[in-house]
């Protein structure tokens, strides 16, 4: 098989050649866009799921849908060490610039940009806790109009964000369209920023304003939002993004191959689904390796067996190993105990991926430690995005098959 023609694309946020199994999510978002365009009330959208299920790819695809509906859009990636103020200002600047050529009153655009500049510069005047800002935070937006005063510049992120997004929505109303802000890795926002974002979305929904937030994050994102505002459970539409079913996984492999006049034998598809578990990133990784090793079409199960070790070696280094290396020895000990217990619980529950959620009390018992003494390791792993707590008193891996990987590594 010609490696130059290999259609598969395992990569972080890289769109696969065939976006299989996400038709429902795309259809739902089309309805959201149309309803808002007609003045109907709609909720902002939150996508949740493990790493490797294609949340970022789907987020980018939804943004393309919004652009096709002539919406203004902006996208940011949340980081645990960065305030929301600066990136959201940049995202809104981009969104309004997309709408500006269709606005009949340039003065209205300039007025909003003045508010936006004041909002952005407020972040540059003082760091968190009133300390002087770091050099990297002394950012000036590329806005030519002077900063306004008395709007979105109080220094209270919740007050300022409500005012800023309300003004941005008014600009979209003037144009007869909407604005969508896309936020990836949303679970990494600070508590104050999450609270401010919830408050802003609440205000926008009450006004029926044409501005929505589309967030993507790990499975515990709903809990993060709920901890910030009790009404967040009713404020957002939540969509769990999971692994592909068998039909969708076969489509993700076969459709790109057919465009290159290549076919798969059924037993090859059976084995590929067994190896990948239906997780989109793994489907692409195994598909790419199999293509490169297959001598001819149709691709056989023997080709998959030959290629699988290469795919697994690449995943072990780039997908699993890079995350494992970020953990301290104490954190690795914690995860190894998790992996062992997850296997037992997964077998008892009939789980074929064998990475079930594990009670923290059982981890402490397995390590012969008091639960309180393990809290620093658990909290650090959650902060690093390696595990999450979906329910009180339990933890699970954020990466599919991570427990399986750990169980193959020497202690």
Annotate each language-model stretch with its function:
Residues 1-43, 94:
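A short, basic N-terminal segment
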Residues 41-61, 367:
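Walker A/P-loop nucleotide-binding motif
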Residues 110-161, 167-174:
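Conserved P-loop NTPase mechanochemical-coupling segment
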Residues 146-219:
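Conserved Walker B catalytic segment
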Residues 191-192, 357, 367-384, 392:
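Short amphipathic alpha-helical interaction segments
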Residues 220-236:
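Short regulatory helix/loop adjacent to the ATP-binding pocket of P-loop NTPases
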Residues 241-268, 275, 286:
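Conserved small helical "lid"/interfacial subdomain of P-loop NTPases
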Residues 278, 284-371:
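Winged-helix-like regulatory helical subdomains adjacent to P-loop NTPase cores
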């Amino acid at each position: 098989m010609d490696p130059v023609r290999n259609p598969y694309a395992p990569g972080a946020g890289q769109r696969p050649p065939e976006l299989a199994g996400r038709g429902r999510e795309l259809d739902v978002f089309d309805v959201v866009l149309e309803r808002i365009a007609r003045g109907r009330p709609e909720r902002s959208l939150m996508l949740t799921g493990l790493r490797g299920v294609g949340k970022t790819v789907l987020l980018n695809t939804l943004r393309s849908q919004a652009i096709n509906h002539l919406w203004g859009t902006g996208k940011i990636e949340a980081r645990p060490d960065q305030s929301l103020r600066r990136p959201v200002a940049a995202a809104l600047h981009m969104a309004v610039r997309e709408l500006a050529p269709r606005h009949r009153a340039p003065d209205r655009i300039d007025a909003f940009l003045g508010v936006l500049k004041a909002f952005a510069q407020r972040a540059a005047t003082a760091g968190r806790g009133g300390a002087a800002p770091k050099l990297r935070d002394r950012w000036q937006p590329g806005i030519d109009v002077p900063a306004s005063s008395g709007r979105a510049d109080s220094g209270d992120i919740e007050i300022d964000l409500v005012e800023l997004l309300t003004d941005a929505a008014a600009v979209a109303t003037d144009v007869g369209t909407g604005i969508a802000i896309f936020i990836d890795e949303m679970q990494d926002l600070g508590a104050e920023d999450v609270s401010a974002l919830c408050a802003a979305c609440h205000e926008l929904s009450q006004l029926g304003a044409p501005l929505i937030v589309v967030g993507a994050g790990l499975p515990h994102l709903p809990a993060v939002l709920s901890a910030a505002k009790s009404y967040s459970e009713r404020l957002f539409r939540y969509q769990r993004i999971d692994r592909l079913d068998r039909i969708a996984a076969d489509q993700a492999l076969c459709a790109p191959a057919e465009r290159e006049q290549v076919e798969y034998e059924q037993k090859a598809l059976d084995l590929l689904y067994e190896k990948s578990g239906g997780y989109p990133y793994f489907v692409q990784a195994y598909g790419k390796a199999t293509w490169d090793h297959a001598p001819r079409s149709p691709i056989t199960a023997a080709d998959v067996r030959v290629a699988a070790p290469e795919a697994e070696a690449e995943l072990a280094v780039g997908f699993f190993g890079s995350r494992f290396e970020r953990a301290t020895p104490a954190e690795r000990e914690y995860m190894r105990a998790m992996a062992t217990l997850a296997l037992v619980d997964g077998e008892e529950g009939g789980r074929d991926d064998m990475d079930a959620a594990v009670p923290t009390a059982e981890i402490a018992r397995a390590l012969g430690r008091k639960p309180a003494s393990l809290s620093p390791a658990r909290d650090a792993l959650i902060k690093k995005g390696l595990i999450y707590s979906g329910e009180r008193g339990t933890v699970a891996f954020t990466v599919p098959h991570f427990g399986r990987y750990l169980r193959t590594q020497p202690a």
